[in-house]
Amino acid sequence: MGQKVNPKGLRVGIIKDWEGKWFADKRNYSNLLIEDVKIREYIKRKLYQAGISRIQIERAANRVKVSIHTAKPGIVIGRGGAEVEALRKELEKMTAKQVHVNIVEVKTPEVDAQLVAENIASQLEKRIAFRRAMKQTVQRSLRMGAKGIKIACSGRLAGAEIARTEWYSEGKVPLHTLRADIDYGFAEANTTYGKIGVKVWIYKGEVLPEAKKPAAGQGGE
């Protein structure tokens, strides 16, 4: 099971949190969900060069808070905050709600699976050999503190007639262990031979559940 399912979805509610934090009744749920998808697609398309790792959306009454996790906050914010203000106005026009945009910097993009996948995809588009791109990326991630990494490239690799999947991995990636903090990312490279899919799994170590504090008057000195 752990081999097939999205590692993030499998761990939601255990060691990972939801990307969208809001509640809605039956009438509004589908509309808000579609709105979330549109917001994410718009931001990703507009700011692809900024290295967007993930987008969190929180809702309260008629307000929407969008947290953008990016490797290059300078591109998102712009000179004097002009870019982020323009983005906020576009989102307000799209949703007809009050929008607050929060920028969160990704300190180590080398161990962020989504950014790693997008980096490999951009290298493939520049005609860099897929094995070289995979190997260099794995070594860089392990140097920056990843416990293990696994990469899969699928498609007409090196312009081959028949599509295939090539794997490269180092370290350990325990997909079945629910307390294992595994990041997952997916990107597509648009080459002259067609699309090449890139999947990345990065193991960052185990997340241990917090120890329960003793009740008042018990176990304390």
Curated annotation (Swiss-Prot):
Keywords: Ribonucleoprotein, Ribosomal protein, RNA-binding, rRNA-binding. One of its GO terms (biological process) is translation. This is Small ribosomal subunit protein uS3. Belongs to the universal ribosomal protein uS3 family. It holds the Pfam family Ribosomal_S3_C. Residues 39-107 form the KH type-2 domain. One of its GO terms (cellular component) is cytosolic small ribosomal subunit. The lineage of its organism: Bacteria, Bacillati, Bacillota, Clostridia, Eubacteriales. Part of the 30S ribosomal subunit. Forms a tight complex with proteins S10 and S14. Binds the lower part of the 30S subunit head. Binds mRNA in the 70S ribosome, positioning it for translation. The gene is rpsC. One of its GO terms (molecular function) is structural constituent of ribosome. InterPro entries: KH_dom, KH_dom-like_a/b, KH_dom_type_2, KH_sf_prok-type, Ribosomal_S3_C_sf, Ribosomal_uS3_bac-typ, Ribosomal_uS3_C, Ribosomal_uS3_CS. SMART domains: KH.
